[in-house]
């Protein structure tokens, strides 16, 4: 045996590039496939598979998974002196990738509008109504003479002028002031009355009654008074009436009552102010005189004037 071994020598054991022993029989490639052929055995081809990983895209609140099958085909070609060897086909690899999807839930802050309360302040304006004014008109009334026939005849005689004038003027707001004038009956004798009838004698009686009332009210107009003049003629005897009929004699009796009332208009609650009525009263009372004194009054040139009475 040794000679054989020495004759042929010990053959060096060959291995491939990966360290696999190379034999003429029973050689396998890197995948374990048997290699057959004569001559020199080429290097074993290597197949490399390429694999791509795919990640599944997760949906919100869902776990996604993706499957991928990678196919790798590798050809290893080695040309040796003994022949050509083609490596086997690469294997198949299947990879299943599971991707977990993070689910993020975002919550936005909700602004809730509060209820605002506004306080409004209103200023009410109080209106004031104007107060109407009333105008009172005074009335002047003439009294009636309760005289006899002769007295009335004298009034009819031409040239005699007997004026009985009474003026009542009321100007104001409200009630009117009243002026009264009265001529009392003369309780005189016959001669006294004859003197009044003598021509040239002038007996004028003037009486002024002035009433002034001032009323002040708040709201409603105050009321004052305006005057009314009244005139009355006293009862006279027969001779007195005859004298009034004699031409040239003039007996004038003037009664004037003037009342003025002012009402002041106020604002607010209604009040009523009343003006006090002024009265002017004048009365002529009959004088009980002797016969000579009455005759003296009847003499021409003598005048009997009675003054003014004024009441406020």
UniProtKB/Swiss-Prot annotation:
Residues 21-30 have a biased composition (Polar residues). Its main location: cytoplasm. Residues 55-66 have a biased composition (Low complexity). Transmembrane segments: none annotated. The keyword Cytoplasm applies. InterPro entries: Dehydrin (IPR000167), Dehydrin_CS (IPR030513). Induction: By cold. It comes from the Eukaryota. One of its GO terms (biological process) is response to abscisic acid. The lineage of its organism: Eukaryota, Viridiplantae, Streptophyta, Embryophyta, Tracheophyta. Residues 1-88, 248-287 are annotated as: Disordered. Expressed in nodules and roots. Keywords: Cytoplasm, Nodulation, Stress response. GO terms for cellular component: cytoplasm. This is Dehydrin CAS31. The keyword S-adenosyl-L-methionine does not apply. It is found in: Cytoplasm. Residues 35-46, 67-88, 256-278 have a biased composition (Gly residues). Interacts with the leghemoglobin LB120-1 in the cytoplasm; this interaction leads to LB120-1 protection from denaturation under thermal and drought stresses. Disruption phenotype: Reduced nitrogenase activity in root nodules, lower ATP/ADP ratio, increased expression of nodule senescence genes and higher accumulation of amyloplasts under dehydration conditions. Belongs to the plant dehydrin family. Intrinsically disordered protein acting as a chaperone. Ensures leghemoglobins (e.g. LB120-1) protection from denaturation under thermal and drought stresses to delay root nodule nitrogenase inactivation and subsequent nodule senescence, thus supporting symbiotic nitrogen fixation (SNF).
């Amino acid at each position: 045996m040794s000679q054989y071994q020495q004759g042929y020598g010990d053959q060096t054991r060959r291995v491939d590039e990966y360290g696999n022993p190379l034999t003429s029989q029973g050689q396998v490639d890197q995948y374990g496939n048997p290699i057959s052929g004569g001559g020199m055995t080429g290097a074993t081809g290597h197949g490399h598979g390429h694999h791509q990983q795919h990640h599944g895209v997760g949906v919100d609140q869902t776990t996604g998974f993706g499957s991928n099958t990678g196919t790798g085909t590798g050809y290893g070609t080695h040309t040796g002196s003994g022949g050509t060897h083609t490596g086997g086909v690469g294997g198949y690899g299947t990879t299943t990738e599971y991707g977990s999807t993070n689910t993020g839930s975002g919550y936005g802050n909700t602004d809730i509008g509060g209820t605002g309360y506004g306080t409004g302040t209103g200023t009410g304006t109080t209106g004031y109504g104007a107060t109407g004014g009333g105008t009172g008109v005074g009335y002047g009334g003439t009294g009636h003479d309760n005289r006899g026939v002769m007295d009335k005849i004298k009034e009819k005689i031409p040239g005699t002028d007997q004026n009985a004038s009474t003026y009542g003027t009321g100007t104001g707001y409200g009630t009117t002031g009243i002026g009264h004038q009265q001529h009392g009956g003369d309780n005189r004798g016959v001669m006294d009355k004859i003197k009044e009838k003598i021509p040239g004698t002038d007996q004028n009686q003037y009486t002024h009654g002035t009433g002034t009332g001032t009323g002040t009210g708040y709201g409603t107009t105050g009321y004052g008074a305006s005057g009314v003049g009244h005139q009355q003629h006293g009862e006279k005897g027969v001779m007195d009436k005859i004298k009034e009929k004699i031409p040239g004699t003039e007996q004038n009796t003037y009664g004037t009552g003037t009342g003025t009332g002012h009402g002041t208009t106020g604002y607010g609650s209604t009040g009523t102010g009343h003006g006090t009525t002024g009265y002017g009263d004048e009365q002529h009372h009959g004088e009980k005189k002797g016969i000579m004194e009455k005759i003296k009054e009847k003499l021409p040139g003598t005048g009997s004037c009675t003054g003014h009475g004024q009441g406020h």
